[in-house]
């Protein structure tokens, strides 16, 4: 019984640590093809300026697709071929926020977008 209580406590402790990292996306919407949208991702619970950050997306009925990555200081950016020249990833380390500017949107860009560390 003593072992069981210790195990439950350990699980609760680990879950608490995981919950300290928060990434909250905003800015999505429904737009016509050819229009623009800007997504934001507010980060907390870790030193944002120390990490490269990614955007990934999941289209309806499909798997996850990597979209873009930006280095910790914003000096390097890489994009999936499907969005290159249309999407721009950026960050503001003073605001702990990641951005994705999406221009010339297409029907195939329809997806749930996630930021990831």
UniProtKB/Swiss-Prot annotation:
Region span, Framework-2: 53-69
Residue intervals of the Ig-like domain: 20-117
SUPFAM superfamilies: Immunoglobulin (SSF48726)
The keyword Membrane belongs to this UniProt entry's keyword annotation: yes
Stretches the record annotates as Complementarity-determining-3: 116-117
Location of the region described as Framework-3 in the Swiss-Prot/TrEMBL record: 78-115
Compartment(s) of residence: Secreted; Cell membrane
Region (Complementarity-determining-2): 70-77
Signal peptide boundaries: 1-19
Quaternary structure note: Immunoglobulins are composed of two identical heavy chains and two identical light chains; disulfide-linked.
Name of the protein: Immunoglobulin heavy variable 3-30-3
The organism's taxonomic lineage, starting at the top: Eukaryota, Metazoa, Chordata, Craniata, Vertebrata
């Amino acid at each position: 019984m003593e072992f069981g209580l210790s195990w439950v406590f350990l699980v609760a402790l680990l879950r608490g640590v995981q919950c300290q990292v928060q990434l909250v996306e905003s800015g999505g919407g429904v737009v016509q093809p050819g229009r623009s949208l800007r997504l934001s991702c507010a980060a907390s619970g870790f030193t944002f300026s120390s990490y490269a950050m990614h955007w990934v997306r999941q289209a309806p009925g499909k798997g996850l697709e990597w979209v873009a990555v930006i280095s910790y200081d914003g000096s390097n950016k890489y994009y999936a071929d499907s969005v290159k020249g249309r999407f721009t990833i950026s960050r503001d380390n003073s605001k702990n926020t990641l951005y994705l500017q999406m221009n010339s949107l297409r029907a195939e860009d329809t997806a749930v977008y996630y930021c990831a560390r």
